[in-house]
C-alpha cells in the first residue's frame, strides 16, 4: 500500500488516501458532495498501544470519523487526528472500555450528541455531567440505543447490533454497528469475538434468513494477528484468521457483495500481536488490508 498517494482499486468503487495534514475543506467537500460514505481512521490500535513503540510503529486507539461529523468511539490519543477546522458534533460508542470511551475527549472536540447502549446510559450520563462540569463545557444530549432499532444520525442510518465482548459492567451490552448511506451497508465491528447470531440476523447476513440483504463494506477488528487464532482473547476479540473465515462465509453465502477490488479493512490491532504496517501490507491474505491512522476510504455502493 502506498501510504502517501491515492490508492485506486476500482474506478467505480473505492478511493483511499493518506491524509496527514489534510485540509478541512477537502474532507468536508468530499463528505458533502459524495454519494458514498467517507471514513477516516483516526486510530487503529488496541488497548496496548501507548505512543511510538520500539519498531517506530504508532497506532492510536481505535476510532473512526464518518463524513466529517460523526465519530465512532474517541479518546485523547486521537485528538491530533481531527483535520483542522473539522468539527464533529456527534459520537456513537461501541462500549465503555477506556480505549474507546472518554467523555472529556468528546467534549473537547465539541460533541453535542452522544449515542450509546441503553444498558449503560445512566452511567454515561453521570460521567458526562462530571466531565462537563470539570471542563466548564455544555452537557451533550445523550440518547440510548436499543439493539436492532435503527436511528438516523447526520444522514446515516445506524443500526446497533450486539457484540461478543464484555466490560466490568456485567449488565452492559456492547455494540457493533451497521451503518448505511446511499446504498453502502458498512459493518463496523469492534470489539467483538466474531459476529453473534442475533447481530447477523438483524444485519441481514444470516444465510438462514432468506429475506436478508448483503452488506457492501466491512471494517473489522483484528486484535490478534496471524498465528494467534487460538489466543485466550478469542471469546471477546477476533484474529486475522477469524476475520478471513467470516469473510469467506459471507462471500460464499452472497451476504457480502462489495464493489470489485474493495478490501476488508482491519482495525483494533494489538501492538504485541502484529507485525509492522509494512509487514501487514505484504503479508495479509486477500481481501484483508490493515488500516492505519490517517487513512481515508470512500465506500461506494455496488
Which residue ranges define each predicted feature?
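Metallo-beta-lactamase
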Residues: 26-36, 119-175, 180-182, 288-297
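N-terminal export signals
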Residues: 5-26
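Structural beta-sheet core signal
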Residues: 91, 187-188, 266
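Conserved beta-strand hairpin/beta-sheet module of binuclear metal-dependent hydrolase folds
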Residues: 32-84, 172-191
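Cap/insert and terminal regions of metallo-dependent hydrolase folds
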Residues: 195-298
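Active-site metal-binding motif and surrounding structural segment of the metallo-beta-lactamase
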Residues: 74-122, 212-218, 223
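Divalent metal-coordination and catalytic microenvironments
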Residues: 39, 95, 158, 191, ...
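Active-site metal-binding loops of divalent metal-dependent hydrolases
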Residues: 44-46, 69, 75-76, 96, ...
Amino acid at each position: 500500500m502506498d501510504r502517501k498517494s491515492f490508492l485506486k482499486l476500482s474506478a467505480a468503487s473505492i478511493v483511499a488516501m493518506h491524509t496527514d495534514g489534510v485540509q478541512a475543506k477537502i474532507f468536508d467537500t468530499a463528505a458533502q458532495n459524495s454519494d458514498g460514505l467517507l471514513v477516516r481512521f483516526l486510530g487503529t490500535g488496541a488497548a496496548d498501544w501507548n505512543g511510538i513503540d520500539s519498531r517506530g510503529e504508532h497506532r492510536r486507539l481505535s476510532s473512526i470519523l464518518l463524513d466529517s461529523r460523526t465519530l465512532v468511539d474517541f479518546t485523547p490519543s486521537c485528538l491530533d487526528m481531527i483535520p483542522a477546522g473539522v468539527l464533529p458534533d456527534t459520537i456513537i460508542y461501541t462500549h465503555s472500555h477506556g480505549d474507546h470511551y472518554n467523555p472529556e475527549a468528546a467534549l473537547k472536540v465539541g460533541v453535542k450528541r452522544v449515542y450509546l447502549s441503553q444498558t449503560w446510559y445512566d452511567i454515561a450520563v453521570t460521567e458526562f455531567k462530571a466531565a462537563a462540569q470539570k471542563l466548564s463545557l455544555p452537557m451533550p444530549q445523550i440518547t440510548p440505543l436499543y439493539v436492532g432499532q435503527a436511528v438516523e444520525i447526520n444522514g446515516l442510518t445506524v443500526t446497533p447490533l450486539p457484540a461478543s465482548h464484555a466490560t466490568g459492567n456485567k449488565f452492559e451490552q456492547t455494540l457493533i454497528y451497521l451503518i448505511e448511506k446511499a446504498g453502502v451497508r458498512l459493518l463496523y465491528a469492534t470489539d467483538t469475538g466474531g459476529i453473534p447470531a442475533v447481530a447477523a440476523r438483524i444485519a441481514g447476513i444470516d444465510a438462514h434468513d432468506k429475506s436478508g440483504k448483503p452488506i457492501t463494506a466491512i471494517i473489522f477488528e483484528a486484535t490478534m494477528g496471524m498465528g494467534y487464532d487460538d489466543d485466550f482473547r478469542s471469546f471477546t476479540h477476533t484474529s486475522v484468521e477469524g476475520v478471513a473465515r467470516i469473510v469467506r462465509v459471507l462471500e460464499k453465502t452472497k451476504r457480502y457483495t462489495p464493489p470489485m477490488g474493495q478490501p476488508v479493512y482491519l482495525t483494533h490491532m494489538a501492538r504485541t500481536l502484529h507485525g509492522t504496517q509494512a509487514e501487514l501490507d505484504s503479508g495479509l491474505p486477500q481481501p484483508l488490508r490493515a488500516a492505519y491512522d490517517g487513512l481515508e476510504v470512500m465506500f461506494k455502493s455496488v
